[in-house]
Amino acid sequence: MCISDSLEAGVDLVCFSGDKLLGGPQAGIVVGQLELVELIARRPLARTLRSDTLTLAALQATLTHYLLDEAADQIPVWQMISAKPETLRAKARRIARGIPSATVEAALSVVGGGSMPSQTLPSFAVRLSGSTDGAQSVATKLRHADPPVVSRVQDGAVQLDVRTVLPRDERMLRKVLLEHLS
């Protein structure tokens, strides 16, 4: 159930995180009946928990994307969640091209976090197999690269879910893979 559904159903207060699925800065947000929100704001503890101006500015920018109906295009977490499988397959192929032992395979992305801990989405991954070092060793090598590459080991191979690779990071990821796997 989304926040607006909860409020429309008559819930007095809803507390949620500004990061996670909202895609903004890390912040605790309280919405609901004005008199209750004001009551919370007047409590002495609220002063120690309030957000600073930078957090509020980042939150305002994030919420503006929602108001302009551009969250899916402008907020990275929603770019990742809304990516189409055919787009992910093409991205995986671009990343895997020319990398020894790299293949492209269907995968499942776990949205994760406290908001959607078991929600999965169809995805594609670059599978790195056939290494004489073993999958754990390859994963460790990639984690210690500059920049680090976080992967998962599944079925004896390293798997890189491309859903979490932003377009601006594709070239850098290929560079790291070529440097450490050739």
Indicate residue ranges for each PLM-predicted region.
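Glycine-rich phosphate/diphosphate-binding loops and the adjacent beta-loop-alpha structural elements
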Residues: L21, I81-S82, V158
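Conserved C-terminal alpha-helix-loop-beta "cap" of PLP-dependent enzymes
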Residues: R89-L173
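Conserved active-site and cofactor/substrate-binding residues in soluble primary-metabolism enzymes
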Residues: A9, G23, V31-E35, R50-A57, ...
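A common structural junction motif
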Residues: R47, R143-V150, L178-S182
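Conserved PLP-enzyme active-site core in the AAT-like
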Residues: S4-H65
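Conserved PLP-dependent catalytic core of the aminotransferase class-I/II
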Residues: T55-L56, Q60-G112
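Short acidic (Asp/Glu) and glycine-rich catalytic loops that position anionic groups and cofactors
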Residues: L34-A41, L67-V77, P117-P122, D155-G156
